[in-house]
């Protein structure tokens, strides 16, 4: 929305004029609560935008100020109200947990207020402190909630959103049934996608490419009809199979032996053995012919996916002995010791999460 409604509409009109936009297409625009007005929302909806993603982040105004956000929670409420008035019936709220000075009580209040706004979709992301950003100075600060506190916040989110009808379909994404983000699902299901602009990435079939990142160079090149592709690669079966594991296990749909072996002509047995180990530890479940992570598995998904990729590589080495020495030199991913027991003792016996103490927690 910072770009301005008029220019966003001009951009969408250019897309319509250049290609074929399906009538049922999901057309999302990200908006900041402080930079969107009712007349802008009406114009956007009339032009064909049909989904809003609103950056709420937190309901605590003090935390919003601390992280440099210019809006208040009241402005979030007004943005949602104006969006409904403008005709939007598909709204997503973005939330962040693990923020500086944020407590579990703060997070529970943010969740409650977000749910009360009745959006069709809610995304809840753990804070990531990126080097080079102003907040990176807080990396080792006691203001940042501990890993255990952030894990508690995550599991609280899963429980509360489920209780109010939001189904989890990916590590950080929840929706009323039928309102999953189709844009996001394209990535996780390895569908084709196209990006436009400096630094944008695309993947068509087995070809992945990106444009140059420098804005001035990109503009000059486009105006002169130059090819602005900066990086280009063809994806082989092994790499595509790895992406299938990485992206599939981010979702509750998970992965399937039949799909893996049919699509990539690769042996799934080593991966299946690793998944069975995850099941024994409480990190994954088998649902029919598919495997997917449990909430505790999602908490350490990066480590677990690393183990699955190692199982995939080990199986490849068995069929290609010449690769074995190189693979054996690679560092191995270590599973966190006692994670299953810690999860059981800390979370599964937590009366707030199990719902046994909800009345007394109000």
Indicate residue ranges for each PLM-predicted region:
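A short, conserved structural fragment
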Residues: 280-289
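C-terminal scaffold of the Radical SAM
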Residues: 1-266, 320-329, 339
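Minor-groove-contacting beta-hairpin "wing" of winged helix-turn-helix DNA-binding domains
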Residues: 290-294
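Short amphipathic alpha-helical interaction segments
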Residues: 265-277
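Short, amphipathic alpha-helical interaction segments positioned at domain boundaries
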Residues: 298-332, 336, 343, 347
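Intrinsic-disorder-associated, low-complexity terminal segments enriched in Asp/Asn/His/Tyr and depleted
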Residues: 345, 349-350, 357-359
């Amino acid at each position: 929305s910072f770009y301005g409604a008029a220019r966003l509409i001009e951009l969408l009109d250019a897309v319509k004029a250049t290609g074929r936009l399906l009538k049922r297409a999901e057309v999302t625009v990200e908006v900041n609560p402080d930079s969107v007005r009712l007349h802008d929302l009406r114009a956007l909806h009339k032009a064909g935008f049909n989904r809003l993603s609103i950056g709420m982040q937190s309901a605590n105004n003090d935390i919003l100020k601390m992280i440099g956000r210019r809006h208040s929670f009241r402005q979030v409420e007004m943005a949602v109200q104006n969006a409904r008035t403008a005709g939007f019936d598909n709204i997503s709220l973005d939330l962040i947990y693990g923020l500086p000075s944020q407590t579990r009580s703060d997070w529970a209040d943010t969740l409650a207020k977000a749910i009360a706004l009745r959006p069709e979709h809610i995304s809840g992301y753990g804070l990531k402190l990126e080097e080079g950003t102003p907040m990176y100075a807080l990396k080792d600060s006691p203001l940042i909630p501990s890993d255990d506190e952030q894990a508690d916040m995550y599991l609280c989110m899963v429980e509360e959103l489920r209780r109010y009808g939001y189904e989890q379909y990916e590590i950080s994404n929840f929706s009323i049934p039928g309102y999953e983000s189709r844009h996001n699902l394209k990535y996780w299901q390895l569908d084709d996608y196209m990006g436009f602009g400096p630094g944008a990435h695309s993947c068509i079939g087995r070809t992945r490419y990106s444009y140059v990142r420098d804005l001035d160079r990109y503009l000059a090149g486009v105006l002169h009809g130059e090819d602005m592709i900066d990086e280009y690669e063809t994806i082989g079966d092994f790499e595509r199979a790895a992406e299938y594991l990485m992206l599939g296990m981010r979702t509750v749909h998970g992965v399937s032996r039949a799909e893996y072996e049919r699509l990539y002509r690769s042996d799934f047995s080593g991966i299946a053995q690793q998944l069975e180990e995850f099941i024994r530890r409480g990190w994954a479940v088998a649902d029919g012919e598919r495997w997917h992570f449990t909430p505790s598995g999602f908490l350490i998904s990066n480590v677990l996916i690393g183990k699955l990729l190692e199982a995939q590589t080990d199986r490849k080495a068995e069929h290609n002995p010449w690769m074995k020495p190189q693979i054996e030199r690679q560092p191995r991913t270590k599973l966190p010791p006692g994670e299953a027991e810690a999860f059981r003792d800390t979370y599964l016996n937590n009366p707030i999460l199990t719902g046994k103490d909800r009345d007394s927690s109000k």
